[in-house]
Amino acid sequence: MANWVFCNRCFQPPHRTSCFSLTNCGHVYCDACLGKGKKNECLICKAPCRTVLLSKHTDADIQAFFMSIDSLCKKYSRETSQILEFQEKHRKRLLAFYREKISRLEESLRKSVLQIEQLQSMRSSQQTAFSTIKSSVSTKPHGCLLPPHSSAPDRLESMEVDLSPSPIRKSEIAAGPARISMISPPQDGRMGPHLTASFCFIPWLTLSKPPVPGECVISRGSPCFCIDVCPHWLLLLAFSSGRHGELTNSKTLPIYAEVQRAVLFPFQQAEGTLDTFRTPAVSVVFPLCQFERKKSF
């Protein structure tokens, strides 16, 4: 026991044969003084109290009050070091986890940036190829792309066909393919100011309503300008030459007979049944496609 410990009543220091006790009010008594006072009452402050015998088996928290400062510093320094080491180990573990997570996220970000750059490069090349194809399609010499939303009568109104006979055209007909002049060539999907197109020459043919499903009748008659409409394409064929009004025997051919098709335009399928627009110079016919013919008859 420390040398500063003594009895608070008789002031005698502890020795081998004496025992000291501690009250909960903080006073120390030797056995002799403790026996002289009342039970459960402090001799100094007269307050109700409880006493604890000071020995090697006393609680460590109580023994700490009688230890030297150096011993207490060493004890608490050691405990503090253990606490610091424990906390530091867990901090390092948490820090290692976050570093690994950050490394994975940085790698994922790097891959994402690389993928975005590749996609942008592919997009740029595809846009270049698309622009090239678009420009090549828009500059085709035979035909033009018509907008799908425009109607057939509007396109027919914007196109004038010149089929008046001339010596030059007669010589061309005798040689083979016929030519028609279209006043107003294509502009913004419409036929605009002057386009000459070559078509297959089939003399003296007129297209009429098919009596048998899947077939169309082509008979000898006045020259006609035929527009064949299917769900995907608009086919323009020019049947010219010959004398007007002369009729001979009819000839039945399968639909889409083997005829040279000179000009193709994208077009939407015409609604309704067979529509015919006639002028003094030309007969324009809108037959349904083969699939619709089979359904209609």
Swiss-Prot record:
Q: Does the keyword Chloroplast apply?
A: no
* EC number, as in UniProt: 2.3.2.-
Alphabetically sorted, this entry's keywords are:
Chromosome, Coiled coil, Meiosis, Metal-binding, Nucleus, Transferase, Ubl conjugation pathway, Zinc, Zinc-finger
Q: Which PROSITE patterns match?
A: ZF_RING_1, ZF_RING_2
Major location (coarse)? nucleus
Localisation per UniProt entry:
Nucleus; Chromosome
A GO molecular-function annotation: zinc ion binding
Q: Which residues cross the membrane?
A: none
User: Kind of enzyme, top EC level?
Assistant: transferase
Provide the GO biological process annotations: chiasma assembly; homologous chromosome pairing at meiosis; meiotic gene conversion; protein sumoylation; reciprocal meiotic recombination
InterPro entries named in the record: Zip3/RNF212-like, Znf_RING, Znf_RING_CS
In residue numbers, the zinc fingers (RING-type) are 7-46
Residues in coiled coil: 91-124
**One Gene Ontology term, aspect cellular component:** synaptonemal complex
Superkingdom classification of source: Eukaryota
Matching entries from CDD domains are given as: RING-HC_RNF212
- UniProt cross-references to Pfam families, sorted A to Z: zf-RING_5
UniProt pathway annotation: Protein modification; protein sumoylation
Associated disorder is: Spermatogenic failure 62: An autosomal recessive male infertility disorder characterized by non-obstructive azoospermia, due to complete metaphase arrest at the spermatocyte stage.
Q: What this chain does, per the record?
A: SUMO E3 ligase that acts as a regulator of crossing-over during meiosis: required to couple chromosome synapsis to the formation of crossover-specific recombination complexes. Localizes to recombination sites and stabilizes meiosis-specific recombination factors, such as MutS-gamma complex proteins (MSH4 and MSH5) and TEX11. May mediate sumoylation of target proteins MSH4 and/or MSH5, leading to enhance their binding to recombination sites.
Specify the protein name.
Probable E3 SUMO-protein ligase RNF212
Q: Which organism is it from?
A: Homo sapiens (Human)
The organism's lineage? Eukaryota, Metazoa, Chordata, Craniata, Vertebrata
Chain's gene name: RNF212
